Amino acid sequence: MSAEIICVGTELLLGDILNGNAQYLAQQLAQLGIPHYHQTVVGDNPDRIKQVIKIAISRANILIFTGGLGPTPDDLTCETIADFFGSPLVESPAIIEDITQKFAQRGRVMTPSNRKQALIPQGADILPNPTGTAPGIIWEPRPNMTIFTFPGVPSEMHRMWEETAVPFLKSQGWGQEIIYSRSLKFWGIGESALAEKVTAYLNLPNPTVAPYAGKGEVRLRVSAKAPSEAAAEALIAPVEKQIKDIAGLDFYGVNNDSLASVVGELLRSSGETLSVAESCTGGLLGQMLTEISGSSDYFWGGVISYDNSVKAGLLGVNSEDLEKLGAVSDTVAEQMAMGVKTRLSTTWGLSITGIAGPDGGTETKPVGLVYIGLAGPGDEVSSFKYNFGTMRVGLRPTVGDRSFIRHLSACTALDLLRRRLLTR
């Protein structure tokens, strides 16, 4: 037994709308312990929807459709499913009454086109929609086959799933075991290098371990199948500990942890403070830090020193060094870090100066060249050189990708501070 998610909507194929429904349903299926191996997105075309159904029923017993339940001519999900299985559509008086009442509550009269939403395959049960006009169905068109349909509006679909589909599936015996996962996060190591280090864990049966790439980072998903979350965590815990020991400082957090949140907790626990000076990242580092609730406990503030006059005037960077070495240099990065630390009276100062591109690079200072400065207690200061323009993420080079170079710069600065706090 397995489930397949089928999301209907040309707007999804065109990329006009992010397909959050598939992500939500995949997570929900895991919580119920229902195997799920395929997802499909298909446009509002009956022939192509039928092709998708033909493939899906050859490999899954539970088909979950989202989208295509509205009143317009291109909303074809229910009628196409019924036609595929050779079932007539019947009008549901209960749905007509529900839609009529909802229109009346809004001071409107139901339009003739909305009657289309009351047509369901003969023998199907209604999935009530508490907020919208598009109900769903639960239907068993043949033995060992269950079909669910939901509207594409996420808020409506979520509520209908939780209030009707989940109880139904549990009544069928699902939910006795769950699939529970923890995402281990790593920075400063590539996916292949990490996979090589943890090769012995990649073929475990339960829990399973699988690497995947995040935005500039690498993650390992450790998943266990067990009767409860606590039982799954007990299976995962020893494997997680062993992987952390192998990865060392390259491991930084789990699940919803971010580099900013981890650094914040380290600063808070030590009673220390941080300030930042940014050039090419233009405030991104400060934004990451202040996205964390309570960051005012340790983050004093920052200076966006985009122009050299600000570097010299507000941070005290030597004008001769700016003229001779340029703003993108180790010396300037160190002076920026020390300058912001001194002026804001913090324990630590972080600085970033570089060439984010896509223009502005030279042969000696190419796009992606970044210097990060770190000033610590007393007169401690150091700088680190990176060339993010030579990196690749999957098949995509970062050179010329201004947004991604800035992201890598800010995250790497946080990672440098994290490692320093852990190893002093």
Curated annotation (Swiss-Prot):
Q: Which Pfam families match?
A: CinA, CinA_KH, MoCF_biosynth
InterPro entries, per this entry?
CinA (IPR050101), CinA-like_C (IPR036653), CinA_C (IPR008136), CinA_KH (IPR041424), Competence-induced_CinA (IPR008135), MoaB/Mog-like_dom_sf (IPR036425), MoaB/Mog_dom (IPR001453)
SMART domains assigned to the protein according to its UniProt record, in alphabetical order: MoCF_biosynth
What does the sequence similarity comment in the record state about its family?
A: Belongs to the CinA family.
Fetch the HAMAP family from UniProt: CinA_B
**NCBIfam families registered for this protein in UniProt:** cinA_nterm, molyb_syn, PncC_domain, PRK00549.1
PANTHER family in the record? NICOTINAMIDE-NUCLEOTIDE AMIDOHYDROLASE PNCC, NMN AMIDOHYDROLASE-LIKE PROTEIN YFAY
Report the protein name in the record: CinA-like protein
